[in-house]
């Protein structure tokens, strides 16, 4: 077939060269955005008198037809037409005649593809924000059901202090809230229009960029045509935000994997989100959590891939920028899938409250309580720390826990110890007392839940 840009050339490219340079195998995902962008563009051309109203109406009818065909997956794309833009233009000309060739007046594929990607990400980021808030809702529900479920809190993966399981869950709620905030802020940079920037220098036609931007729902336009066609910061920002979101999901998945093991037994995954072994009949593997953890590296890779593509590009457009799309598409699909799986996995998991409770009665996570007990009686905390350290050593040598130590032994360490210290050793009491702002105390968790509901309630119907 003849190329829409073929006037300059006397030889045709080899078929394998065409295939190497074509992007239609993946950028066809932009078909709706491409057609909607073209409808806005030709509407603007008619308003400015660059094409007649009759020509514009004929072009728009043709584009609307192609849009309906696209929604029903009836369009057939060709490698020879290279990309989504030339495929649509070719189909349009075949449908309505040569007047379809006027669509590209005052426009380049450079600003066209940038517009498509802005429209695409604007829509997909909104979807991801919604899916993240749905996951946050699941976390709120689990936290509400586990306010008084006591578990070990960890540092260095060693038992540190008793905490509420709800407090642990809500830590991830606030991580996801930062992710939502980052995505929402990025929309300010996604929601600007490059349409009308041309190949790199603008156009001699009297176009109205603000009008076409308004038709497409953009909040403004790029102020520099070179920047408009060469900018991929908005994609990099999306990939960066998605990498942080996936990192948060991966951290939680790592804990779910540990907690579901025989060594912990804190939770049990629903059969819906676990698999078995082909050889070991007893196995119940947390495959979905492992896959989310693994797919995090995939999203990181997409970020670093585009950063590497961009680092050496002179202004303005370069064919290297064709490599900006597959990682973007892949990240959208990966993040959306992981969010939905994570929500279902957390919603259906069983919390073993008894095992968690046993864990905080068979360790030394209440040691800080004794140090605080002494400090509250006027002993410098460093001295209290030293005394409790010796008590823990004594217990490990005897094979007992702090609650098993007789009062006489405590008094040998410090005369400040009294009978009331055993009340301090209760994990439940230890958690309840930690009512500093943001702490694990039950009153603080109730306050945190109210704030959390306020953030997602309007969006997902929590009252």
Curated annotation (Swiss-Prot):
GO terms for molecular function: argininosuccinate lyase activity. PROSITE patterns: FUMARATE_LYASES (PS00163). One of its GO terms (cellular component) is cytosol. Belongs to the lyase 1 family. Argininosuccinate lyase subfamily. Its main location: cytoplasm. NCBIfam families: argH. The keyword Ion transport does not apply. This is Argininosuccinate lyase. The keyword Cytoplasm applies. It catalyses: 2-(N(omega)-L-arginino)succinate = fumarate + L-arginine. Pathway: Amino-acid biosynthesis; L-arginine biosynthesis; L-arginine from L-ornithine and carbamoyl phosphate: step 3/3. PANTHER family: ARGININOSUCCINATE LYASE (PTHR43814:SF1). Signal peptide: none annotated. GO terms for biological process: arginine biosynthetic process via ornithine; L-arginine biosynthetic process. It comes from the Bacteria. InterPro entries: Arg_succ_lyase_C, Argininosuccinate_lyase, Fumarase/histidase_N, Fumarate_lyase_CS, Fumarate_lyase_fam, Fumarate_lyase_N, L-Aspartase-like. Its EC number is 4.3.2.1. Keywords: Amino-acid biosynthesis, Arginine biosynthesis, Cytoplasm, Lyase. It holds the Pfam family Lyase_1. It is found in: Cytoplasm. The gene is argH.
